[in-house]
């Protein structure tokens, strides 16, 4: 992830201020359905003895994390045979969705698997969108969290005690997709801003206060 962050900083600081100023994009954005980009499948359901050790198994907690998912960040583990490991495999660019939630607002929350070297598996309370179309994985994460997309998903989520999202609901979500070049540019800008905010949040309170006082007397 650090490589992506440094790449984002470099691009944001390029001459002409293309990404900083966010000048109007000149190419048209194409309307697509999410089902054209992803092939959906429910996750692994094993016996209680299957969990606790084995290969990394992506759960709802990983999907809800603010950071992208990688092999190292996955919290759970499960023992899967070779056929199961292949069937429930999660690879770079795949999108993971929360299948069931306790409230309407969180229904269908998504995250993206961003490990280019090692795969993982995913559990039964998660829907995997296997990457079958062309898109930038960083861009798609931010696009799927936009109000326009979230409203489509939550509006069609159903349930009483638990709010469920179906594969059909996800496949029918309408998207506006720019060119791959613009997807990369937009995605890296948001990635840079996210990392910048995170870095500032980690600063000790006294450091932030000193910085404000210094600016006051300049």
Name every feature range the model reports, one short phrase each:
Residues 1-218:
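Feature detects amphipathic, helix-rich regulatory segments
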């Amino acid at each position: 992830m650090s490589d992506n962050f440094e790449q984002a900083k470099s691009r944001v600081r390029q001459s002409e201020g293309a990404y900083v100023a966010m000048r109007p994009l000149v190419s048209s954005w194409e309307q697509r359905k999410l089902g054209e980009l992803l092939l959906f499948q429910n996750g692994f359901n094993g016996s209680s003895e299957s969990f606790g050790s084995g290969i990394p198994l992506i759960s709802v907690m990983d999907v809800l994390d603010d950071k992208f998912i990688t092999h190292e960040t996955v919290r759970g583990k499960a023992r899967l045979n070779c056929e199961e490991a292949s069937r429930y495999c999660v690879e770079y660019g795949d999108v993971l969705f929360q299948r069931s939630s306790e409230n309407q607002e969180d229904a269908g929350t998504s995250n993206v698997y961003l490990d280019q070297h090692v795969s993982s598996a995913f559990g039964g309370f998660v829907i995997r969108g296997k990457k079958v179309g062309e898109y930038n994985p960083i861009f798609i994460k931010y696009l799927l969290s936009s109000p326009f997309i979230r409203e489509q998903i939550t509006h069609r989520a159903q349930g009483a005690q638990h709010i469920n999202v179906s594969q059909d609901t996800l496949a029918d979500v309408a998207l506006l997709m720019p060119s791959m070049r613009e997807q990369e540019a937009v995605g890296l800008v948001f990635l840079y801003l996210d990392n910048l905010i995170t870095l500032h949040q980690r600063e000790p309170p006294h450091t932030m206060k000193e910085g404000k006082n210094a600016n006051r007397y300049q």
